[in-house]
Amino acid sequence: ATAICHITLDCRKFETQCEKCYLLPLPIGCDIAKRTWQRKELIKGRSHIIYIACSKWLQNEAKKSALIGTNVIESIPNPIDTNIFCKTNKNEARKKLGLPTDKRLILFASQRVTNNNKGMSYLVEACEKMAKQHPEILVNTAVVVLGGHAEELCNSFRLPMYPLGYVVDTQKIVDVYNAVDVFVTPSLSDNLPNTIMEAMACGVPCVGFEVGGI
C-alpha cells in the first residue's frame, strides 16, 4: 500500500502519493519513491487484485492507500500451531535454557533487538523506574533478551540480564516463552506480531503499547 517502505510510522503520504521519502536521501533528479509509486499505478490488472492483510489494523490502514483504491482487502491472521506453542513446565524450561529458577523473568524478543522501532529503550527506562520504586526487583527479577545483537545490551540494565541471541530452533523458542513470567513488546509501530500470539498460546501475559495491531 506504499511505494517502498514496510513501516510508515507517522508518514501518511501513502494516502495520496508517496514521494520524497524520509527513509531515502534527498532525491537529486530522481525521486525513487515517486517513480516506484507511479510504476505500481501502471500494473496491468491491478484493479482485479484481492489483498490479504494479517491484522484488522493493517487491513484498515491499507484501505486508506491511494494505490489500493476500491480493491477488496481481507484480514487473515497468521496461524499459530497450538500443538507446538503451548504451556509446559516453567522450571524445566528454565533449566534447559540455563535461566534462574528463583527469579521473575521479563522477556523482550525481536529479530534485531537494537532496532529502535522495537522500543528497547522504553523497557530499559521502565526497569530503571521500577528498580527505584521497588529496589527488591534488583534481586528477585531479571530480563531475558531473545534476538540478534542481544549481547550488546548487557550493560543497559541494572537488573540481571540474560542474552539468548538469535534463535531459529522452534522448540527452544517455545522453551523461552514457557520460562518467563511476562512478555514485553514496547514497539512504536507494529502489525500483529507472531511473538505475541505465540507467547499467549504458551500462557504468558503480554504487555505492549496500544499501537498498530498490538
Regions found by a protein language model. Give the residues of each.
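A short, active-site helix/loop in glycosyltransferases that binds the activated sugar's phosphate group
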Residues: 27-75, 80-84, 90
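Short hydrophobic beta-strand element within catalytic cores of glycosyltransferases
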Residues: 205-208
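Conserved donor-binding/catalytic core segment of Leloir-type glycosyltransferases
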Residues: 100-118, 124-128
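Aromatic "clamp/platform" in nucleotide-sugar-dependent glycosyltransferases that forms part
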Residues: 188
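Short alpha-helical segment that forms part of, or immediately flanks, the ligand-binding pocket
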Residues: 174, 193, 197-201
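A short alpha->beta transition loop at the rim of the catalytic pocket in nucleotide-sugar-dependent
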Residues: 181, 203
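Nucleotide-activated donor-binding/catalytic signature segment of Leloir-type glycosyltransferases, i.e.
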Residues: 137-140, 147-174, 182
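A short helix/loop element that forms part of the nucleotide-sugar donor recognition site in Leloir-type
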Residues: 86-99
